[in-house]
A protein has these predicted regions:
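Glycine-rich loop-to-alpha-helix module at the N-terminal edge of alpha/beta enzyme cores
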Residues: 15-102
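Short, small/polar residue-rich loop motifs at catalytic or cofactor-binding pockets
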Residues: 1-4
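Short, acidic, Ser/Thr-enriched surface-loop or helix-capping motifs
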Residues: 10-11
Length: 102
């Protein structure tokens, strides 16, 4: 099996349109050469780092600054997650904390 652009291919090399974006984790398609190159470069530097200790990799800090720069006024905090589920879970916890429900 493999993916190419908006298509996936089965073991018989039959091509199908993958209309669900890999369940939302491949919204830019499969095997995008620019994304493969960028991800490969980053994997060589630092593939993952937690933020538990209040430290952040330079690449994440730079991206956060760019996001704040284009966000509407007042949206000046950035929290990186691994998935939409993690983002939603964290957002709910922040609201609970803010409302003193924790």
């Amino acid at each position: 099996c493999r993916g190419e652009g908006v298509y996936v291919y089965d073991n018989s090399n039959t091509r199908f349109i993958e209309g669900m974006s890999g369940l939302w984790c491949a919204s830019l398609g499969f095997n995008n050469k620019d994304l493969v190159e960028a991800a490969s470069k980053q994997m060589e530097k630092l593939p993952f780092y937690h933020s538990f200790a209040g430290k952040v990799p330079e690449v994440a800090a730079n991206l956060a600054e760019k996001l704040v720069g284009i966000a509407p006024e007042g949206l000046d905090k950035v929290f990186f997650c691994n998935s939409g589920s993690e983002a939603n879970d964290t957002a709910i916890k922040v609201v609970w904390y803010y409302q003193n429900a924790f």
